[in-house]
Structure formats: structure tokens, C-alpha cells
Amino acid sequence: MSEEMNDQMQVRRQKLQELIDLGIDPFGKRFERSATASELKSQWDEFSKEELHDKEDESHVSIAGRLMTKRGKGKAGFAHVQDLTGQIQIYVRKDQIGEEDFDNLWKGADLGDIVGIEGVMFKTNTGELSVKAKTFTLLSKALRPLPDKFHGLQDIEQRYRQRYLDLITNQDSTQTFINRSKIIQEMRNYLNKQGFLEVETPMMHQIAGGAAARPFVTHHNALDATLYMRIAIELHLKRLIVGGLEKVYEIGRVFRNEGVSTRHNPEFTMIELYEAYADYHDIMDLTESMVRHIAQEVFGSAKVQYNEEEIDLESAWTRLHIVDAVKEATGVDFYQIKSDEEAIAAAKEHGIEITNNMKYGHILNEFFEQKVEETLIQPTFIYGHPIEISPLAKKNPEDPRFTDRFELFIVGREHANAFTELNDPIDQRERFEAQLVEKAQGNDEAHEMDEDYIEALEYGMPPTGGLGIGIDRLVMLLTDSPSIRDVLLFPYMRQK
């Protein structure tokens, strides 16, 4: 910390002690507000200076917030007070709030202090709506000065590490998180109206399942048991489908022990939903309708800007088989490739990076990820994923090499994963056994055998469609945020 900052903190500590010596509580008590900054502007800004003067008797208000600017000398001064909704100017005069409060509270007030004001509305000569203070109350003394003259943090990493400072100084950041909350609320509203039931399932699992990812491992001391933080919500929700809860969803945290990037955080928020008697076509329709609804309700339009690109959520979304997508981009037709050896040869010919033990389906997926994925800017459903990478999805009845699965891509990123759920317990066991072979060959993200889940399927699960959406990435898209850290209040940061 700079010498200047240390000096400022020392002065603030001295002011704190002076307040205590005067018998003033520098950290205040309950303060009743009558309005927020935005409410005052909505109610009073339409009136002229003269009209407000005539309405002074009926414009008594009380506001509270953080002191963001302060100016003026002598017996009067102006300041801006900020709350969640914005800023409002206040005007403080000694002959209005009293000599004692003016000298002890107003004159010693620092930027960052939290204050309460009671007064009346008026407009200045320049036409700015303001509150003429009748009382001025200190609610919390700030012992540290705000960074960068309160114009916002310039150090991006500091914004993430000290989100509270970012929220104080950056209204755009605050609005992003308000919008995040609204997005999740509209998601709930949409699903509740569709008859879905919101549920809660365990975050600590005995088997890490439901996705291809490395788990975080923990230990239950009393039971002497190894547990895994969930990498997906899926398998517990499908047990509920077996139990007769026909339309369920959960919004919750998921944990994956993987890298950190602009698109990945070790803990993130997902929604997973499952609907009995539906298939992946129904879930495509639901996904498209729900995302469009959220954009329209929260932002007033189903066309959004992302990184200077207009994303059209309003028009019908493209639906493309993964084989056709690869063929369009590379000319390679995986319908005509009949063996792993042919797939490996095609990969070598087109410079596709593959690893040992990859089979037909893995190689098709590598073609897609390396040649197609980043080109999918407008909303596109890619469906028909190969069976090797879809251990929980139902086989396509017309071509068992593929599954009834889709992923949603927008701005070159995956935003959703869904399929017609595999409800055949015999097939499911065979898929898990194939995953165990992959694990033995070095794929540490392959799925474990889950006997309890197979037992649940043996009681009978109806045909079911399921969906998972990464909420953080959806918020990134809808708020035009370049990094996942911009939409997580407290993203993971490497320790200093």
C-alpha cells in the first residue's frame, strides 16, 4: 500500500476517534429510508425548479447510501450519495442541519462513508434534482479510501479479488449481477409455468457421475468415507423420474477439478431438468423457447449483442447433425467411414490431433471440436453425437453409432447439453463397462460403474428428455461479458 494511502487511513482513524470522543457512534444504527435514488428521480425529476419549490411541503424524503463526491467550503456543500439504484445529489447547509452536525459530521465526512439524509426535493440552478438536507446522519465510517478516485477499478484482477470494491465503483458490474439474478428468476418462472417441480439433491456423492470430468475429493470423518463433490446433477434427478416426479429441475452448484479460464471456473452453476414422456426434440423446443423468453423478459429483446456481434435468438435456431456439420466444414463424411482405422486415417489427412485409444466416435468429436465448434456463432443445435462420448444417452434407432443427443452452440461455445435419456438398464450397464475400459486405458474422466443407478433403472424409467445448461455461460452471453469471472461474484483466483 502506498504512503499516500497509509496517510489517508491514519487521518480517517483520527476522525473515528474524534467521533467516539464526542459520543457519536461512527457505525450508526437502523435508518428508515423512504425512497431510493432511482425512485426519487422517477417521482420528482419531471417537475421544474419552481414546481418543486411549491411542492416542498409534500416532498419530504429520507435516503441513505455511500458518499461518492463531496465539494464546497464554508457553510454549505454538495455531495452525491449512491445506493443500489444509482446516485442522487444532496445539498447540506449549516443553518439547515445545525451547527453541531455540520461541524462534527458533514465537515469530517469522507468519500466512502455511508450516510443518511432527511430533507426535501429541489432543483439546482443547473436543473439537477437534489435533496436539501434537514438532517445528516453518519451510518458507517469508511476507514479505507475508495480506489482510483471512485471512477472504477482499472486493475481487472483486483476487481475479481475485491468484488465489493468493484460493485461500489462500477455500476456496469453491479447491473450485470442484477441481470444475472433476473435471468435465473425468469428461468424459474418459465419452468414453473410449464409444470416443472424444483428439487434439491445431494452435492456430495459416493460416485462421481453424470459427466466426463475430474471430481474434487473429500472425506467424511465420522463415516470414514470418501466422497466426491458432484460433477453433475443428472443421476439423482433421473432417480426422481423413476420415482414418478415427471417434470423436475434443479439449479445448483457443480464442481469440476479442472483448469481455470475465461470459460471455466472450478465451481459453477447449472440447471438440469428432466421431463418424462419427452425426447430430445421436445427438449430442443423447450430450450429455444426458454432462452428466447429469458432474453425478452430481462432485456426487452430476443436479439442481443455479444462482442460486437448481434446474436439472433428470435429467429428459428439451426439444427444440424454432427456428421453433416463436419462434412460441411471439412468434406469428410463420417457416415461413409466404417471403422476406427478409417477414422484415424482421416484425422491424419486433415491434421486433427488425436490420442491413443481413440475410436470412431472420439475422432468424429475431435473433428467437430477442432474444425467446426468455433464457427457456430448464431444459435445452433448440433445433434446425433457418437455413442462413445455419450454414455447416458439413448442410441439412435436408425444408426446405433449415434445417440439422440444435442448440444447448443452460440458464439462458438457450448451452452447446453441434452438427450433422450438412456432408460434401458442392460444397455446402461454395457455403457458403464465400456467406460471402465477407457478408464483403465488412461481416460481419468471416464464414467464409473454406478450399481445403485442401474438398480433404479431396473424398476423402470419412462422415456425421458433431459437438459443441462451452464448458467454462467448463458449470463455471459446475455450480458456481453467476455470472461466467466465477470459474471461470478467471487470467482476462483490463484492465491497470492
Swiss-Prot record:
<dbReference type="InterPro" id="IPR044136">
    <property type="entry name" value="Lys-tRNA-ligase_II_N"/>
</dbReference>
<feature type="binding site">
    <location>
        <position position="407"/>
    </location>
    <ligand>
        <name>Mg(2+) 1</name>
    </ligand>
</feature>
<keyword id="KW-0963">Cytoplasm</keyword>
<keyword id="KW-0460">Magnesium</keyword>
<dbReference type="InterPro" id="IPR002313">
    <property type="entry name" value="Lys-tRNA-ligase_II"/>
</dbReference>
<keyword id="KW-0030">Aminoacyl-tRNA synthetase</keyword>
<dbReference type="GO" id="GO:0000287">
    <property type="term" value="F:magnesium ion binding"/>
</dbReference>
<keyword id="KW-0067">ATP-binding</keyword>
<keyword id="KW-0648">Protein biosynthesis</keyword>
<dbReference type="InterPro" id="IPR045864">
    <property type="entry name" value="aa-tRNA-synth_II/BPL/LPL"/>
</dbReference>
<dbReference type="Pfam" id="PF01336">
    <property type="entry name" value="tRNA_anti-codon"/>
</dbReference>
<dbReference type="GO" id="GO:0140096">
    <property type="term" value="F:catalytic activity, acting on a protein"/>
</dbReference>
<feature type="binding site">
    <location>
        <position position="414"/>
    </location>
    <ligand>
        <name>Mg(2+) 2</name>
    </ligand>
</feature>
<comment type="similarity">
    <text>Belongs to the class-II aminoacyl-tRNA synthetase family.</text>
</comment>
<keyword id="KW-0479">Metal-binding</keyword>
<dbReference type="InterPro" id="IPR004365">
    <property type="entry name" value="NA-bd_OB_tRNA"/>
</dbReference>
<dbReference type="InterPro" id="IPR034762">
    <property type="entry name" value="Lys-tRNA-ligase_II_bac/euk"/>
</dbReference>
<dbReference type="GO" id="GO:0006430">
    <property type="term" value="P:lysyl-tRNA aminoacylation"/>
</dbReference>
<comment type="subunit">
    <text>Homodimer.</text>
</comment>
<dbReference type="GO" id="GO:0016740">
    <property type="term" value="F:transferase activity"/>
</dbReference>
<dbReference type="GO" id="GO:0005829">
    <property type="term" value="C:cytosol"/>
</dbReference>
<dbReference type="GO" id="GO:0004824">
    <property type="term" value="F:lysine-tRNA ligase activity"/>
</dbReference>
<keyword id="KW-0547">Nucleotide-binding</keyword>
<keyword id="KW-0436">Ligase</keyword>
<dbReference type="InterPro" id="IPR006195">
    <property type="entry name" value="aa-tRNA-synth_II"/>
</dbReference>
<dbReference type="InterPro" id="IPR018149">
    <property type="entry name" value="Lys-tRNA-synth_II_C"/>
</dbReference>
<protein>
    <recommendedName>
        <fullName>Lysine--tRNA ligase</fullName>
        <ecNumber>6.1.1.6</ecNumber>
    </recommendedName>
</protein>
<dbReference type="GO" id="GO:0000049">
    <property type="term" value="F:tRNA binding"/>
</dbReference>
<feature type="binding site">
    <location>
        <position position="414"/>
    </location>
    <ligand>
        <name>Mg(2+) 1</name>
    </ligand>
</feature>
<dbReference type="Pfam" id="PF00152">
    <property type="entry name" value="tRNA-synt_2"/>
</dbReference>
<dbReference type="InterPro" id="IPR004364">
    <property type="entry name" value="Aa-tRNA-synt_II"/>
</dbReference>
<dbReference type="InterPro" id="IPR012340">
    <property type="entry name" value="NA-bd_OB-fold"/>
</dbReference>
<dbReference type="GO" id="GO:0005524">
    <property type="term" value="F:ATP binding"/>
</dbReference>
